[in-house]
Swiss-Prot record:
Keyword tRNA processing: yes
Protein name stated in the entry: tRNA uridine(34) hydroxylase
InterPro entries: Rhodanese-like_dom (IPR001763), Rhodanese-like_dom_sf (IPR036873), Rhodanese_C (IPR022111), TrhO (IPR020936), TRHO_N (IPR040503)
Catalytic activity: uridine(34) in tRNA + AH2 + O2 = 5-hydroxyuridine(34) in tRNA + A + H2O
One Gene Ontology term from the biological process aspect of the record: tRNA modification
SUPFAM superfamilies: Rhodanese/Cell cycle control phosphatase (SSF52821)
Protein's UniProt keywords contain tRNA processing: yes
Any single Pfam family the record assigns to this protein: Rhodanese_C
Species of the source: Baumannia cicadellinicola subsp. Homalodisca coagulata
Active site: C200 (cysteine persulfide intermediate)
Record-listed E.C. numbers: 1.14.-.-
């Protein structure tokens, strides 16, 4: 019988990855294109990825694919061949290679069929998410950043912008992409004739945002090719100065990639300079926040005294039950 889902417990998965001796590379990619049967595509793609022992998180929808994966270095070429032949729309698809491969990003393969690749809250039936194609390479980005008449818009969540962003980029204050789209339209409504450059981590959010801006009458919309990851990789390759400062937040176990030595954020508890995200160890909370090492020790990895007390109470209860 075909295996179409992970059936190994989390502890065993961690043991397996720790036992690996071959390094892995984190890769991300996306593509907006029409998938007639997402469930069939998902099952076939899962079998192909699982055979190559690829880990990661992959979303499939009628509007395309969005993937962040971890690949054994010896199987990167085999993965490319498989990907480029799995669907005509994926042939020669751009791959974003992670900026930091010193830490493990994924421990298992998860692949889900979703209604949308990115939850956008858009209700207009005539909206075309495929209508965005003005991509800027790193060298073009650096030139445009020097022009005060051009607006750079960060389409990531506020906690991502907090730890790193392009110099002089405008933040659209919100915690989700769904919230961000109407706010962006309102904030920029008097700039429909100006050149606007949008960016995000790897490109998928700013591509949909670019199409939405064009749909709403904005005339000159551009996006950074490959997002922050694509920009940094190309800038480093060409020896260009990096105009992105700080850390690039990522949605995997690493929670961030160091781009420059600048630390532009602060610990949410003591306000000292820090840009390390973590999740509150109180599982009833699990809040994502920035915490320095001193506060990690002081609060037992929790975001508040209340969560710390809840965690300690739970640990005490577990110890007492174990003794019994």
């Amino acid at each position: 019988m075909l295996c179409l889902h992970n059936k190994i417990c989390r502890n065993k998965l961690h043991q397996n990855i720790l036992a690996e001796t071959e390094p892995r590379t984190t890769i991300s990619f996306y593509k907006y294109f029409d998938i007639q049967n997402p469930n069939l595509f998902r099952d076939r793609f899962y079998l192909q990825m699982n055979e190559l022992k690829i880990f990661g998180r992959i979303y499939i929808a009628k509007e395309g694919i969005n993937a962040q994966i971890s690949v054994l270095n010896s199987r990167i070429n085999a993965f490319r061949t498989m990907l480029y032949t799995s669907h005509p729309q994926l042939d020669q698809l751009r791959l974003n290679f992670a900026l930091d491969n010193n830490r493990q990003s994924f421990w298992m393969l998860r692949m889900k069929v979703k209604k949308l690749l990115v939850a956008d809250g858009i209700q207009e039936p005539n909206f075309n998410c495929f209508n965005a194609n003005n991509y800027l390479k790193a060298e073009e980005v650096n030139i445009l950043l020097e022009n005060p008449n051009i607006l750079f818009i960060d389409m990531r969540n506020n906690y991502e912008y907090e730890v790193g962003h392009f110099q002089h980029a405008m933040e659209i204050p919100s915690r989700t992409f769904r919230e961000k789209l109407p706010i962006a339209i309102k904030m920029l409504q008097h700039n429909k004739e100006r050149k606007i450059v949008m960016y995000c981590t790897g490109g998928i959010r700013c591509e949909k945002a670019s199409a939405w801006m064009l749909h709403n009458g904005f005339q000159h919309i551009f996006q950074v090719e490959g997002g922050i990851i694509g920009y940094v990789n190309r800038a480093v390759k060409l020896g260009l100065p990096l105009k992105f400062i700080g850390k690039n937040f990522v949605f995997d176990d690493r929670l961030g990639e160091r781009i420059t030595s600048d630390v532009i954020a602060y610990c949410h508890q003591c306000k000292n300079s820090c840009d390390d995200h973590t999740n509150c160890l109180n599982q009833d909370c699990h809040n994502l926040f920035i915490q320095c090492r001193q506060c990690t020790k002081k609060y037992d990895g929790c975001c508040s005294l209340s969560c710390q007390q809840t965690l300690r109470t739970r640990i005490t209860r577990l110890k007492n039950n174990f003794i019994k």
